Design a protein with these regions (language model features):
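N-terminal secretory signal peptides that target proteins for export/translocation
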Residues: 1-12
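Bacterial N-terminal signal peptides
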Residues: 18-27
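Beta-lactamase-like hydrolase cores
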Residues: 32-73, 151
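Extracytoplasmic
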Residues: 53-56, 75-77, 81, 85-86, ...
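Active-site SXXK
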Residues: 66, 79-104, 130, 189-192, ...
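Active-site-proximal helix/loop microenvironment
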Residues: 70-85, 163-210
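Conserved catalytic neighborhood of penicillin-recognizing serine enzymes
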Residues: 100-155, 160-167, 177-178, 198
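A penicillin-recognizing enzyme superfamily signal
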Residues: 152, 182-298
Length: 306
């Protein structure tokens, strides 16, 4: 199938994937709402046939209802390590350690000596660029305070966003996903992000969430860790993570030491989709490219339906 005029090239689709794509494209929005089963089945077929690799797992939600549209994940309710996808919730817990919310600090990242993945460091970091560039040093500083004195705040955030409580013996590295002890079921994690970007809290917390949204928007731009997600109508919110691989039940085996994850929410200002993708044996930054292609398939169907 040829690319849409004016769009970047799309991957060729199999016959079954192409049929599902056309079914979605030709289905009016009213029909999708009246027959959600047909819409979800067509979307599932399109994504599975267009992205058949067993190394790619995903959860696609309707951002407004938090209902699952499509899913390919061996055990979607089993908790898994999610790496840096925990960072926004640690930031929320940090802000809730006082009332009014705490001010976020400026942290100087020197690189590996500060526990960061970027060997040369990020330099002076505040919340928004630290989230966009996933600076470990910055979030380790927040998490250290949360681990030592913010247990109640973290429990409130976990309960509000329906995340499992972290283990009792908390460390800063665990809270930001550097080590794999705090694990989250994939579907629950996608729903927590939907709640995060659509929540309507009090004015003080709305300001904090607004900064988190800005950081996730910048993550998808050049220089951000999710920049490979590409350009999309209305832009996107994104957060990457690279998590230690833990072999799962059955035939789930590690292909490398780590797995790449990315959460993509689109469009940024009026979210329609929440897409969580995990790709085995790579980084979150690389997985963002796969997620971007999946999102493009969804967007193409919407463009044709208009």
């Amino acid at each position: 199938m040829e690319a849409l005029a004016g769009s970047r090239a799309r991957p060729l689709r199999s016959r079954a994937a192409g049929f599902a794509f056309l079914l979605i494209a030709l289905m009016p929005v009213q029909a999708q709402e009246a027959s959600p089963g047909l819409y979800t089945q067509a979307t599932q077929t399109m994504l599975d046939r267009s992205f058949p690799s067993a190394q790619i797992e995903y959860v696609l939600l309707d951002a407004r209802t938090r209902q699952t549209i499509a899913l390919r994940w061996g055990h979607p309710d089993a908790p898994v390590p999610v790496g840096s996808l925990l960072k926004p919730f640690v930031a929320l817990a940090f802000s809730r350690m006082s009332n009014p919310p705490r001010n976020f600090p400026t942290v100087v990242c020197h690189g590996k000596s500060d526990g960061c993945w970027r060997s040369g460091g990020h330099g002076s970091m505040t919340l928004v660029p630290a989230l966009a560039e996933s600076c470990n040093a910055y979030f380790l500083a927040l998490a250290q305070d949360v681990a030592s004195g913010g247990a109640n705040a973290l429990e409130r955030v976990s309960a509000e966003y329906e995340l499992p409580k972290p283990p009792a013996q908390k460390t800063a590295a665990m809270l930001i996903g550097v080590t794999p002890e705090w694990r989250i079921p994939p579907v629950a994690l996608a729903r927590s992000y939907a709640s995060l970007v659509l929540s309507h809290n009090d004015a003080a917390e709305r300001e904090v969430i607004g900064r988190l949204r800005t950081g996730m928007r910048q993550a998808a731009l050049p220089g951000g860790t999710a920049s490979k997600v590409g350009s999309h109508p209305g832009s996107v919110l994104a957060k990457t993570g690279t998590a230690p691989c833990i072999a799962g039940p059955g035939d789930e085996r590690c292909v490398a030491n780590g797995d790449g994850l990315v959460m993509v929410i689109a469009p940024a200002e009026s979210p329609r989709w929440v897409l969580l993708v995990r790709q085995r044996g790579t980084t979150g930054a690389h997985t963002a490219e796969t997620a971007g292609k999946m999102l493009s398939s969804l967007e193409d169907a919407v463009v044709l339906r208009r």
